[in-house]
């Protein structure tokens, strides 16, 4: 315990560590501010002039305008949403074949008359996409029968989409469909919508997770490498507790520091992020806010927590691997370069290899659950599967399973390899 306490103090007295901790804390309010600031709302004032408000004011206007189209979105509300759009389109000569992108539709008319049904109509169009091409019908093409059959069609759309992405019906795509529908059966219907949080907010949770893991990686880089660089490790290893006990203490101290930092920063970020919107919006179904093809039976708030937990598991795996690299490299600079390279490697693989091999490779890497374009956040809202023979494995399962194993593996290897180095 004495050595462990000394290692904690050593880390907290390091200038670079303190700077990185401060950066992690400052990023929380900065990133939490952006999603809400992007929101805009346009209306006509008493003089007939269009006025655009942004940020919190726009969110309040949107919530005020939502009317009956919130709470449980029943078949009656689906029909009412479709009728509202048809009445709106009928007010324009020839209708609106280009939808809201018609040049005759002003921003204020859209916001005040049909923006409150836009998300619902988009999900209806998505559910009735052509199973052979994946192309969704336009809003004008929707029928009352499709509105009343929306919820039963959602399951069929999941099935059609997985077959379309997987190259048709086969034993392995059947396995994927079975897993997806098993999860979708647990989705609460009718879907729930509460004004507030936006899809951008969910993406920012994933972005902040990546930045936290990046910061924690650089915090841990010098744990072993700094002594290797100055050759102080040769002296330390001559002491009675300078090998195994010191290695274990350093590993535990590093993991405790970055783990505590992650939990504190993530809690602060989620609190500030959701406070900038409206906590009521956390009850919205993912299937309405994001896509009907999301088969996770969770609300927006539950997904945010899940992303945070998944990020923590990935952090542990990445931290253990970083400690392993720190003990193997001769300088802090080389350890930093190697750690950063492995952190962004899943993103490189995602862009370079799109097939089944690429999915396996990026998910099995220690940092496979974080990234700007390839993270657990996107995988949890996608229908991507990796295949082993005829067995389908949903990518989030693969990411978290690999991270859990790698955390234990590399934590042990970090201590063993450092102790044996120089023998």
Task: Annotate each language-model stretch with its function.
Residues 16, 242-243, 331-336:
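Membrane-helix interface segments
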Residues 26-79, 146, 150-227, 248-328, ...:
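Secretory targeting signals
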Residues 220-235, 239, 243:
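Transmembrane helix boundary and interhelical loop/hinge segments in multi-pass membrane proteins
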Residues 359-383:
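Short hydrophobic, aromatic-rich alpha-helical segments embedded in or entering the lipid bilayer
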């Amino acid at each position: 315990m004495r050595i462990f306490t000394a290692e904690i103090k050593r880390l907290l007295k390091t200038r670079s560590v303190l700077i990185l901790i401060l950066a992690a804390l400052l990023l929380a309010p900065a990133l939490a501010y952006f999603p809400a600031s992007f929101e805009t709302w346009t209306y006509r004032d008493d003089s007939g002039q269009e006025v655009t408000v942004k940020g919190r004011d726009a969110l309040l206007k949107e919530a005020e305008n939502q009317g009956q189209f919130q709470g449980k979105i029943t078949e009656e509300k689906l029909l009412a949403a479709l009728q509202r759009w048809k009445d709106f389109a009928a007010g324009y000569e020839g209708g609106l074949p280009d939808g809201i992108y018609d040049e005759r539709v002003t921003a204020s008319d859209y916001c005040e008359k049909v923006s409150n049904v836009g998300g619902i109509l988009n999900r209806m169009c998505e559910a009735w996409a052509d199973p052979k091409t994946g192309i969704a019908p336009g809003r004008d093409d929707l029928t009352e029968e499709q509105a009343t059959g929306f919820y039963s069609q959602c399951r069929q759309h999941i099935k059609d989409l997985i077959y379309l992405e997987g190259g048709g019906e086969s034993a392995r795509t059947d396995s994927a469909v079975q897993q997806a529908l098993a999860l979708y059966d647990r989705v609460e219907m009718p879907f729930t919508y509460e004004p507030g949080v936006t899809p951008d907010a969910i993406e920012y949770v994933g972005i902040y997770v990546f930045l936290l893991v990046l910061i924690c990686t650089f915090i841990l880089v010098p744990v072993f490498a700094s002594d290797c660089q100055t050759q102080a490790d040769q002296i330390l290893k001559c002491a009675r507790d300078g090998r195994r006990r010191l290695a274990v203490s350093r590993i535990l101290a590093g993991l405790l520091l970055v783990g505590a930092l992650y939990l504190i920063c993530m809690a602060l970020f989620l609190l500030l992020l959701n406070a900038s919107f409206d906590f009521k919006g956390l009850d919205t179904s993912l299937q309405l806010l994001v896509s009907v093809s999301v088969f996770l039976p969770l609300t927006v708030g539950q997904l945010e927590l899940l992303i945070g937990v998944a990020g923590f598991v990935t952090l542990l795996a990445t931290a253990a691997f970083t400690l392993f690299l720190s003990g193997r490299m001769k300088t802090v600079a080389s350890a930093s370069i190697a750690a950063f390279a492995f952190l962004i490697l899943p993103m490189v693989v995602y862009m370079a290899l799109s097939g089944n091999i690429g999915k396996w490779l990026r998910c099995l890497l220690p940092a496979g659950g974080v990234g700007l374009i390839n993270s657990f956040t996107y995988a949890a809202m996608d229908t991507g599967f990796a295949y082993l023979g005829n067995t389908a494995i949903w990518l989030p399962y693969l990411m978290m399973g690999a991270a859990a194993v790698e955390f234990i593996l590399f934590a042990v290897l970090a201590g063993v390899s450092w102790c044996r180095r120089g023998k």
